[in-house]
Amino acid sequence: MPYDIHHEKNYSQDARSVYDAALKSAGELKGQMLSSSPNDLRFEVKFDKTILGKVLGDRTHITCVVQSAENGSKVVVDAYPLDAVGRKLMFGARKGVTQTVIDMFTTHLENNLK
């Protein structure tokens, strides 16, 4: 089972609007912003084991990049689990946690675009 997950999704909205919605989504999920580059439409965020009261079991690191695409924009998300010190977890991660965080992030992003 791969711990690193790569996820891409296209949206009809322009890249700046999608980037702003993605930032808002990370904040709504109580993510800790590690770095942000508004000019490059890119940010990195760390999520704790518990998101919106749901205990997931692992911390998760997400890198989100919004790119201009035909008829809108594309969101590229790369995510992986973290250990207690904040390093990339190479073994022992709980199954499905990273994908669950990506799904929650994507759901909030899409709600913020409405």
Mark where each language-model region is:
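Ser/Thr-rich, low-complexity intrinsically disordered terminal regions
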Residues: 1-114
